[in-house]
């Protein structure tokens, strides 16, 4: 009976899944255009040929054929809305668009801007001039080659499963946001506005992890690609999506994340003068910091569990304005020195996958798919290379695993709840018990994501006879 129910769930979404299979397989065969050096004003770049043979097109005409070993390098500069090209003292002219087109499967260009550290990229290079008299550089590259470059730029480590996880979430994001910069004439930029893509991938272990996950994305129960945000370190607890952005998404729920503790970015501190700290809330958020209650709360704010606001002020706004590593911090005040210290945890927005948590989980031997499910609640892996039959079987197995995980989580919740109730019962004084209950109930509910019934609230807690 259970298997039949699961199979019916899979069949219900099967047509959607087949459409997704076709879409993903089609898109992944294509190239993507990525704007590189997007954070820099490039006034000049020298291009040399590291591997393979290239045809250099000026507008739509072949200007020169160049290959590795020929010692050819070309310098490009903006000139009156066009791109000028010169090489070894010879001036080729100025053109609306210049394209370095790869003629071999493996072709690599070395780009050396005048004001930025050089990089190497595979595939084609398209160069145009901007209205600001700078160069716009676009790498036209195979999708999976791009993903490998993103993985190398976004995460550290030395285990294949680390790179497999990052490749899957980066691929999912790229597929879902394929037209993010459509109006600009390319797919993605190379910065965190999209995903970091700061060089071609040169590490074999990253290439292996990307290849082993080729075609794999993350979907929800309808077969739709999910949002896959990630951050450096959660500080021990990830954040709900609605606490950072606008929408509450069922797969972006806050989870305990002990794997992120004791890592490079797990803790931080930042100090302010009391005048600057209180002045920020007074000037920016119009709080009356001369009020004793408000002042006390601002100087003794605590977050044993993640919270979204401090006195109604979104912590995301505080983080941005004061350039904090995260919103997960507590406040202490030294009246002698007049210093306010923020003791913080984690690095980044806190939603979705923690990269350092992923690293630790992989080090402990936890499989890549379990890592993904830990951070994206109820998510399913979509294997593009599967046949329809294998895909449905895999889909069913994943749903069964999610149900089993939910059973285990329910058991853990009941155990924790019973332990918590037991500790309350040991408080002999009824008023003290009610006070402790009111103080801890919200955190317990948030932690275990359940609501107490009226019986628990009225009969079990407040009217219980304390244990001897």
Task: Cite the ranges covered by each PLM segment.
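Conserved, single-site charged/polar hotspot
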Residues: 2-6, 15, 21, 26-468
């Amino acid at each position: 009976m259970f298997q039949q129910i699961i199979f019916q769930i899979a069949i219900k979404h099967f047509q959607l899944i087949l459409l997704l299979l076709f879409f993903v397989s089609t898109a992944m065969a294509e190239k993507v255009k990525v704007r590189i050096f997007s954070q820099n004003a490039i006034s000049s770049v020298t291009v040399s040929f590291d591997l393979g043979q290239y045809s250099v097109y000026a507008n739509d005409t072949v200007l020169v054929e160049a290959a590795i070993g020929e010692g050819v390098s070309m310098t490009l500069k903006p000139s009156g809305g066009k791109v000028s090209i010169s090489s070894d003292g010879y001036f080729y002219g100025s053109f609306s668009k210049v394209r370095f087109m790869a003629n071999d499967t493996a072709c690599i260009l070395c780009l050396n801007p005048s004001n930025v550290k050089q990089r190497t990229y595979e595939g084609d290079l398209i160069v145009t001039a901007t209205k600001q008299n700078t160069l716009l550089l676009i790498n036209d590259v195979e999708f999976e080659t791009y993903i490998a470059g993103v993985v190398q730029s976004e995460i550290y480590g030395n285990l294949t499963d680390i790179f497999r996880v990052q490749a899957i979430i980066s691929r999912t994001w790229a597929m879902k946001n394929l037209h993010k910069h459509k109006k600009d004439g390319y797919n993605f930029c190379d910065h965190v506005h999209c995903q970091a893509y700061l060089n071609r991938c040169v590490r074999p272990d990253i290439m292996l992890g990307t290849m082993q996950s080729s075609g794999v994305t993350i979907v929800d129960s309808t077969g739709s690609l999910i949002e896959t945000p990630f951050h450096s370190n959660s500080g021990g607890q990830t954040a709900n999506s609605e606490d950072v952005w606008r929408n509450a998404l069922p797969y972006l729920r806050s989870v305990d994340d002990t794997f992120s503790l004791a890592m490079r970015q797990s803790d931080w501190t930042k100090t302010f003068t009391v005048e600057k700290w209180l002045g920020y809330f007074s000037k920016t958020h119009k709080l009356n910091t001369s009020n004793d209650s408000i002042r006390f709360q601002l100087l003794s704010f605590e977050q044993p569990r993640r919270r979204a606001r401090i006195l109604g002020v979104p912590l995301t706004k505080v983080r941005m304005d004061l350039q904090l590593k995260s919103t997960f911090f507590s406040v202490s005040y030294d009246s002698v020195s007049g210093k306010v210290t923020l003791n913080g945890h984690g690095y980044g927005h806190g939603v979705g996958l923690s990269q350092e948590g992923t690293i630790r989980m992989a080090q402990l031997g936890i499989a890549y798919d379990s890592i993904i499910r830990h951070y994206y609640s109820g998510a399913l892996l979509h294997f593009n290379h599967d046949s329809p039959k294998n895909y449905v079987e895999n889909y069913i197995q994943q749903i069964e695993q999610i149900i089993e995980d939910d059973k285990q989580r329910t058991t853990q919740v009941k155990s924790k709840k019973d332990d918590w109730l037991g500790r309350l019962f040991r408080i002999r004084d009824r008023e003290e018990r009610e006070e402790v209950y009111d103080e801890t109930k919200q955190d317990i509910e948030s932690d275990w994501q359940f609501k107490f019934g009226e019986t628990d609230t009225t009969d079990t807690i407040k009217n219980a006879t304390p244990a001897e």
